[in-house]
């Protein structure tokens, strides 16, 4: 089941509908509460994914006809980026749910979805998965099973620049704030490609190869006709989150 959403409220509503289908049609009735594991990509509140997770969590508990036993794990992917280093997270998850049958796994965002997919057979081979808040580019259909559902963002990257030009038509230069973690390097490539048609209209400067202090200095020296587009910054060029 694949659902695409363009807005955060729409995404949360679609995720709740998918969760209901997975929880109450793909699992058998039980007197025990429904056990749901939410997997976060980052180790701290990081918008928009933390906002999506918070809304989903609150609405799921509020609207469920049965008790929800909720578990949450944060992977801190900004710091732990090599898959060889994720064994402690696997062991923690194993200990967290030992002796308990999970009814649904909900990874929020693409990095947590990749982690869950890599370790699925080891941790929860028969549990349905609902991927929420990843972009459609990141989750190919072949990576899903018949027990999975996805509620994906459909990001219109050129629309970001179009919106800047609509709000500030005098803009001649845009600085793109984006970090240098693996996920940010992916998005830098996507942004560069999708922004290319506007290269003759705007000077586009990329901050992905700068430290945070260098970003601040560069931003402070920008001319009045420049705009800053903050896309994603979880790790700067020095590897500092």
PLM regions and their residue ranges:
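Short hydrophobic alpha-helices and adjacent helix-cap/hinge residues
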Residues: 2-241
């Amino acid at each position: 089941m694949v659902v695409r959403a363009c807005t955060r409220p729409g995404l949360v509503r679609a995720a709740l509908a998918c969760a209901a289908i997975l929880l109450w049609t793909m699992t058998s009735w039980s007197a025990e509460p429904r056990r749901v594991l939410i997997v976060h990509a980052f180790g701290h509140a990081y918008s928009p994914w933390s906002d999506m997770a918070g809304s989903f969590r609150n609405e799921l508990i509020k609207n469920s006809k049965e008790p929800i036993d909720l578990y949450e794990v944060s992977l801190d992917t900004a710091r732990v980026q090599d898959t060889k280093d994720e064994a402690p997270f696997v062991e923690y998850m194993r200990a967290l749910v030992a002796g308990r049958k999970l009814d649904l796994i909900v990874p929020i965002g693409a990095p947590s979805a990749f982690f869950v997919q890599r370790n699925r057979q080891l941790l929860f081979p028969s549990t349905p998965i609902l991927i929420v808040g990843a972009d459609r580019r990141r989750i190919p259909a072949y990576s899903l099973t018949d027990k999975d559902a996805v509620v994906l963002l459909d990001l219109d990257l050129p629309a970001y620049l179009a919106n800047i030009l609509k709000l500030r038509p005098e803009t001649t230069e845009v600085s793109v704030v984006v970090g240098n973690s693996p996920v940010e390097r992916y998005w830098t490539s996507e942004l560069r490609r999708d922004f290319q048609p506007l290269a003759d209209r705007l000077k586009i400067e990329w901050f992905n190869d700068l430290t945070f202090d260098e970003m601040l200095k560069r931003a402070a020296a920008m001319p009045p006709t420049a705009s800053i587009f903050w896309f994603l910054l979880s790790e700067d060029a020095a590897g500092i989150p």
